[in-house]
Every structure is written in structure tokens, then in C-alpha cells.
């Protein structure tokens, strides 16, 4: 099927295909020595955001990725790739760390959007997304963002601001 002749629904079906590659495939294929880092140092960790330090052609980099599962169990663990505020705060913490140590940031975006539950709103979902967007625009380290599949709403924009 030629991509330009596809409807929006057909495009969505392709990017939601359960057997397509995810960050769990791309990270080990692209990077060496990936070490995952956890938590926002405020509330907790969020399995919808995978972040850490790796090497790319012997260059240290910071990797921040939205996680999408392949089955119900994996999707439940990653909240169906809908990050909570602590996920966005974790991403920003790692971006600040990358800037401090002069590491480029590589983000992988794949989300239908941020989690919109009451608890996420109580923990400052809107503020966390807005702060990520604003702060990523001022980082003094290179930022690359790759959209792997879905890029819905502010939940995607929070990791899509790049050079």
C-alpha cells in the first residue's frame, strides 16, 4: 500500500500494530552500554518513560523514550505509553543532567498523549508538560527527537522539542 494514498485511520492502524519495533528494540540496536536511570526525585518513577545513559559510537548520550508495549501486560506496565507527571519530571531531570555533563539528548516519542486521570492532574500533569516544553527549548546541549509512532497531544510535545 502506498503511504500517500492511505487514510488517517490506515496510518493509525500501522503505527499501532503490536508487532512493530518499539524503544525496547531500538535502544539495544542503536546504543551500547545503556544504563537505565529511575525516578523524578519528587514523587516516584514512571514506567511509561524509559531513560538513561548510553554510548553511541563511543559518545556518551542521554536517552529518553516513551515506552509502548506489545501485549496487554506490557501496555499495563507502561500505562499504555501515557506518561504521568513523574515521567515528564524524570525526563527533565535527565535532560538537565545531560546538559551539565555535556551529553546530547536523544528522545524517542511514541504516545497517544499524556495520562489524563484525576491523580495525574492532582500531581501537576499540565505543569510538568509545560515545563518540559519550555525547558527543552533552552537546553544548551543538542537534542534530537525521533517520532517512532504516535505523537499525540502535549504528551508527545514534551519530548519532541528539539534542535
PLM segments and residue spans:
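Terminal-region recognition feature
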Residues: 1-150, 154-157, 161-163
Amino acid at each position: 500500500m502506498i503511504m500517500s494514498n492511505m487514510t488517517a485511520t490506515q496510518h493509525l492502524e500501522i503505527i499501532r500494530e503490536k508487532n512493530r519495533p518499539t524503544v525496547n528494540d531500538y535502544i539495544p540496536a542503536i546504543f551500547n552500554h545503556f544504563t537505565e536511570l529511575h525516578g523524578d526525585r519528587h514523587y516516584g518513577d514512571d514506567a511509561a518513560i524509559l531513560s538513561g545513559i548510553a554510548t553511541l559510537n563511543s559518545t556518551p548520550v542521554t536517552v529518553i523514550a516513551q515506552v509502548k508495549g506489545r501485549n496487554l501486560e506490557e501496555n499495563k506496565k507502561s500505562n499504555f505509553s501515557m506518561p504521568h507527571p513523574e515521567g515528564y519530571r524524570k525526563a527533565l531531570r535527565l535532560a538537565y543532567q545531560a546538559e551539565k555533563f555535556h551529553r546530547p539528548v536523544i528522545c524517542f516519542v511514541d504516545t497517544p498523549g499524556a495520562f489524563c486521570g484525576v491523580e495525574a492532574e492532582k500531581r501537576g500533569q499540565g505543569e510538568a508538560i509545560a515545563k518540559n516544553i519550555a525547558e527543552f527549548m533552552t537546553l544548551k546541549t543538542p537534542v534530537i527527537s525521533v517520532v517512532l509512532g504516535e505523537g499525540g497531544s502535549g504528551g508527545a510535545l514534551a519530548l519532541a522539542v528539539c534542535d
